[in-house]
Amino acid sequence: MTRIRPDYDAIVIGAGFSGVRSLWELRRLGLTARCFDAGSDVGGTWWWNRYPGCRTDGEAWVYALKFLPELLEEWDFTERYPPQEEIQWYLSRVLDRYDLRKDIEFNTEVKSAHYSDHDSIWKITTASGKVATARYFLPATGITSIPKEPPFPGLQSFKGEVYQTSTWPAHEIEFENKRIGVIGTGSTGIQVITKLAPVAEQLIVFQRTPNYVIPAQNYPLDEKKREDIKKTFDATWDIAKRNLAGHAVKHSGRMVASAGGPEEIQRVFEDGWARGCYDFQLGTFDDSFMDPHANAVTSDFIRQKIRSIVRDGDTAEVLCPTYPFGARRPPCADGYYETFNRSNVKLVDIREDEIEVYDQGIKTASGAEYELDMIILALGFDTGTGAMNKIDIRGSQNRSLRESWTRRLETFAGVLVHGYPNMFVVCGPHLPAGNQPVSLEAFASWIGKTIEHMETNGLASIDVSNEAMDAWTTHVEQVWGGSFLAKHAHEQGSWFVGTNIPGKPSRIMFYFGGMVNLEPWLIKELETGWSSMSFTRLDGAEASNGVSKQTVGGVHVTPEMLESVQIPLEADKVGMTPAEKSKLVNAATAVYIDMAVEEMRSRGLAPKADYRVHWWKVMQDFVDSGEGQRVLQETSLTNQELERVIAKLGIEGEVIARMGPEIVNILTGKTHALAHIMRDDLLFRVYLSDEGRRANRYMAEYARLLTSQRRDIRILEIGAGTGGTTSEVLNLCSPNGESFCAEYMYTDLSPGFFNAAKTTLKKWESHLAFQVLNIEDDPAGQGFKEHTYDLIIAANVIHATARLTNTLSNVHKLLKPGGVFGLVELTRLTPFYNLTFGSLSGWWAGVDEGRTESPLQSPQQWNSLLKQTGFSGVDLAAYDLPGPERHSCLLLSTALSNSVTTNGH
């Protein structure tokens, strides 16, 4: 049977925290991935839950992604507990920062995921009937993404507005002067109630089960607090990882049983209450959730708080839970109990008085009627297994996950399920109860290492043993079963065990031992070579399954691997994406070019009769073009505004500020461009700037991959000049000056660069050799032996030669057969590069070859030229930026043995 090739290496379901983190991990590995999400934008549950007052009760400093340090540096939350819109903005920023949005299909609901034993491939089918296939399946569907269905008779008959918090509409809703009924007093209901009470004409709260609501004690984050967060971030996360609930709260070491009397207990509780939320829950007494007596003392303190806050005694008693603190997840909110002191707020106890909806509102079984304009359903979620059970997931031998989990909820460490090969669950059932982002980092990292192991070793599938899954599941059940809260959670309809959903079997959905006790299970697998896992190997036939194994020079490398390399950029410091900065750089440059053209024309000036004639024509053509006019019309700036923009643009801003005002003088020969761009090493720094750095870093990353496999390779760099690319390569391949290759030959047309380079690169002096090379002439006549080098690097130099085919043929002579040519080149003329390099004579070396507009070539043109001169063509192209802003790339090509030996003819 012919095996199919999958569409992607991996498919991710869900674009919330877990999905975004998973996409980045897959991109890091160089794998192709597709993410499907039913929402219209990123966020997962944070996209759907847009109800008034929605915010996290996890503190900002631990409710974030942590896979790279710039995520912290580039973003500041504004409050201790970020609101929904900030969480969504944050995730959207991450998508755009790492160009992940292109891999996501929004408004796409997944209906089924079926595994093929024959092909080791998952087939994903969407609600619209679209089918996509992949080797790896990563459900990152979340634990609170499936709303609980409203069970109320007569809901369709209601003539007013009905909204469910978990599917809140995007449009604005008016609440003022309306009679509003809210059904539900879990975390969501409490936030809605607190937010709407001040604006509603009347707010009727229908409560079945009261909750222990702890004040959040939210506050805005000032600049000092934000600085402190960044300084102590790693230490704070270490605390959160050790905390059983994943929050940055140290265990107090105190026990109620050994406290120094009622006054001391009261003092500790009051202090925790004043600090709020998890400082009260987790930072007062360590036995509050462990010991029945300690729990009773804690519960009674909260009940006394309720009675002291709520003025109406009957209302206060209805708000007081009678079950133990922690049997249901305690919500956190500011001002909740105070809300019931308002004259427009009424609490209705429906614990033993069922409700139904009629055309005018809600009525109880006892006969009370409440006329309403709006009903808000805050009913909670089918947590834990709900989202995955909604998808028809079938593993090996067509085994239904939904049916398997109905019998017993089983996983291995919350990540793998026996019988479902290559399915990596990301923060689903058996996730440690508590703060998800802290657990997510450990899960995503382990999944990435496991997939990387499979890719490196040619493994087709992974499946955890039934014994390992049973051992973990039994551990989860024993940890929960050993708590006195287990029985109460079942009785109180807690979503911890799923009994909030009618008919759903009582199963512990989460792990109550914390990530500190889960992660060792994962680490053990890494340390023992995945001893609890079985793998199948890719043979020759199975290789057609579509494993992404692109190799250049014997190294596994893909554009995705290189383009996902994280590079600290100046744009990061001012909160811009690289694409945003590039757009501003070119817009600011265009303003100066426009002013120069206007001055030249109005004064009747002519350029000096040399290469500047070509430069002048290109500038005029740009200003007169539709594209130029569009850029200029979109860049309407006063001189002061232009200066402010340029000041934010780092090295590129220096170039614009220095060269822009001198364009007319350079054109007319009154001054020379080199006098400006060489001052203060500006030209050298241009190659290290955001505009020039990404493709250079790709070159360095490929060199690192190559030299990590072979230390005997010989490297030659053409036109190394100021050493910008060299520095990137050496810092990555040999950060401490250690040996990494047999030879690194540093060449340039002029020896004048060598002394400065020897000083700059002194750490690597024992590895470097320096020799003059004019690549336009035969290398053999300059003392170079043919077919000597394994890797030749040329960064933004080949285009500045007179005859490209002649130059490339000379490069080919220096490479061994099978050697790799790494060509970093600009691929599109931008206003900035026209200003920076168009002002230099070397830019126009190719005029006689017909390159009069620009010396630059597109990747397609380079592909053709390389094939003409003894190379394989472009084996790989990795670009600097997405879409229309891209203008630079790394091209890798292999030297063929049947070489062209005559200067391209």
From Swiss-Prot:
* Site entry: Transition state stabilizer: R329
Q: What is its EC number?
A: 1.-.-.-, 2.1.1.-
InterPro entries hit by this protein: FAD-binding_Monooxygenases, FAD/NAD-bd_sf, Flavin_mOase-like, Methyltransf_12, SAM-dependent_MTases_sf
Task: Could you list this entry's UniProt keywords, alphabetically sorted.
Answer: FAD, Flavoprotein, Methyltransferase, Monooxygenase, NADP, Oxidoreductase, S-adenosyl-L-methionine, Transferase
Q: Where is this region: FAD-containing monooxygenase (FMO) domain?
A: 12-215
Q: Name one GO molecular function term.
A: methyltransferase activity
Q: What does this protein do?
A: Dual-functional monooxygenase/methyltransferase; part of the gene cluster that mediates the biosynthesis of pseurotin A, a competitive inhibitor of chitin synthase and an inducer of nerve-cell proliferation. The PKS-NRPS hybrid synthetase psoA is responsible for the biosynthesis of azaspirene, one of the first intermediates having the 1-oxa-7-azaspiro[4,4]-non-2-ene-4,6-dione core of pseurotin, via condensation of one acetyl-CoA, 4 malonyl-CoA, and a L-phenylalanine molecule.
> What note about domains is in the entry?
PsoF is a unique bifunctional enzyme catalyzing two different types of reactions at completely separate steps of the pseurotin biosynthetic pathway and comprised an unusual combination of two domains, one homologous to a methyltransferase (MT) and another to an FAD-containing monooxygenase (FMO).
Indicate what this protein is called per its UniProt record: Dual-functional monooxygenase/methyltransferase psoF
Q: Which organism is it from?
A: Aspergillus fumigatus (strain ATCC MYA-4609 / CBS 101355 / FGSC A1100 / Af293) (Neosartorya fumigata)
What gene, per UniProt, encodes this protein?
psoF
